[in-house]
Amino acid sequence: MAYCGGLDWGSAEHGVCIIEHDSGKVAAQFPVPHDAAGIADLMRRLARLAPPADLPIAIERPSGLIVDALVAAGHPVVPIHPNVVKASRPRYRAAGGKSDRGDAYLLADLLRTDGHRFRRLVPCSDEIKALRALVRGRDALVAQRLVLANQLRALLDSFWPGAAAIFADIDSPIALAFVRRYPTPDSAARLAEKRIKAFMAQHSYCGRRTASELLARLRSAPPGLAGDSEADAKGELVRALAAILTALVTQIAELTSRIEHTIGELPDGQILTSFPRAGRICAAQILAELGDVRERFPAEDQLAAEAGVCPVTHQSGKRRGVVFRWACNHRLRAAITCFADNSRHSSPWAADIYQRAKGRGCDHPHAVRILARAWVRVLWRAWQDRTRYDPTRHRGSRVSTA
């Protein structure tokens, strides 16, 4: 007898439901603790019902330890988007209720009745998984750096604005070194042009400002009015934030170097870095989300939808609306639009598409998405054919430069 399974993921416990394919009757329903014993017990229970290859499991997320365990055991894993699950709940509960057991059954029944609409998960290679871990980890650290940098700037603005204004980026190595050395206005009271020059030389300052200009920035900022005790206390906080940011910036730089090395060694990485102004980090961000499984995107329209660079059309009768696509891979959209924005400074074809979009009244983000949609066609073709980008073979590029 054929079965279909549904697994409602949870951080501490998963809900599992197995139903008969023909009748939809529940064959088994049970919770699974998210630990080694629970996952091992799940595999034993599933094996008693049917061979792994004959028992597909539907789940809302395409990754995680439980997904890896199911794939390793030989079960076909079918990811179903949470929006699809949410839209399907009224089919099963008119009152709009929700439970883990109910969602597990819903997933299993969706797989039973609409399984032909969903694509089976095909895992990426280990190299792509490693790249994805590096890229996403770096992105998380960059986001944390921004939070801490804003916190440090706000703290300095509250009692010593000059220290936040002297260098352009508060999270640059020289700016962090400055606030560690001079965390309060009193500590910089005797700071003169000669000391600034020595500080610049010590930290290999490569900016365009002279020592006198930097000192003028420091002195022209509004004076802080904090008392001595308050200034000393906030100075300690400045040192603490600067120390954390310094370590964070160092780790981000090391991860960046590792990612740039990794993307250069991957065949698909060499394809993506061949595009104009893609850059190694941007190319790595695209490849981390794109993966190396060609069957995942059999058509370029599917990749465009996944990347969120094509709009959604709502049409009913005489009414028709085209709106922004919210449901997509936001990481992939950010990476592809970043590449598209950079490419217009190097590719005449890309610049022409962008300028024509601006001429139609599109704002900058909209024009960049239009350009990204055009690039997706080219990127998808090169990725599918496993060939590097060649502007001499790009017909659109040849026409725009003729």
Describe each region flagged by the PLM:
Residues 1-402:
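A detector of single, family-specific signature residues
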